[in-house]
Curated annotation (Swiss-Prot):
The lineage of its organism: Bacteria, Pseudomonadati, Pseudomonadota, Alphaproteobacteria, Hyphomicrobiales. Keywords: Cell inner membrane, Cell membrane, Ion channel, Ion transport, Membrane, Metal-binding, Sodium, Transmembrane, Transmembrane helix, Transport. It comes from Methylobacterium radiotolerans (strain ATCC 27329 / DSM 1819 / JCM 2831 / NBRC 15690 / NCIMB 10815 / 0-1). One of its GO terms (cellular component) is plasma membrane. The chain crosses the membrane at residues 6-26, 38-58, 70-90, 103-123. This is Fluoride-specific ion channel FluC. It catalyses: fluoride(in) = fluoride(out). GO terms for molecular function: fluoride channel activity; metal ion binding. InterPro entries: FluC. HAMAP family: FluC.
Amino acid sequence: MSFTTCILVMIGGALGTLARYVVSVLSLPISRDLPWGTILINVTGSFIIGLFGTLTLAQGRFPVSENVRLFVMIGLCGGYTTFSSFSLQTLDLMRNGAVVRAMVNVCASVVLCVLAVALGHVVAAHWNGGAVQIAQVSIEEDG
């Protein structure tokens, strides 16, 4: 773990957090019954990590350095997506007696995010010219 890598992840996280804030504010008008902004953020973030993670593998269409993958997948996507907000909003729905809406939020978030990662991977694998195993970003020591 180098200083440069830490800075890249930190900058990615800051940019992802800013993007999350902007999307949250812009989605307020549609978030009356369910926290659609958080769902949108988590689904789009899941798609981005699936797409980028596959396209940028060494055998992918756009291979990039591990630092770039860390910047996007850990920093940007980590700062952008928000499991803690999802959890708090689900708890608030349950506390307010909206148990069915809370369960819809849980099911919609989980199913849509997994589908978004899969879709991102499928699109990227197609662009790569065939099936490619999706790989997580390596967070091991830089050596």
